[in-house]
Amino acid sequence: TYNGDHMSMYGVNAGVPKTLVKYLVQWVAKNGVDEESKATLLDIVDTPISPELIPADENGDIKQKTEDLVGPYELHDFFLYYFLRFGFRPSKIYYLANIAFGGVYDEETIKKWLSTFFRRFFNQQFKRSCLPDGPKVGSISISPRGDWRMPSDASFAMWLKEIENL
């Protein structure tokens, strides 16, 4: 949701990949809180990520699970890391992903989500261009005031063409 992350004066988790957020919450639950808080945090970790503004279905179940639409976050974080940290082309990222996730995802699934990643990464740049200040936590950052410079109207066409030729 555009503007949801932009309303705050400081983006505390902007530099933390989604997969790392889950592990951080698990660590805090197991190492730093009382039993009641631990149960709450572990329940949050076990809940699929979804847009919180969409109401549950008639059975109280989550109607829209984000990973069903955009793909597994572990793949997206992998793609993001190798794209930003090393500047690898889609073909090299695809090759590495097939090695890293070979027993988990087949080649077509990796290709599908790699294509989705690049399309969304380029199409959503306008959201990153106006992020509030935030910390750089790891070795990569998508903050426009830090490591990442990209025009909001950049085209992803050459990236998708390379993926189509895999």
What residue spans do the PLM features occupy?
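ATP/NTP-dependent adenylation/nucleotidyl-transfer catalytic domains that generate, transfer
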Residues: 1-166
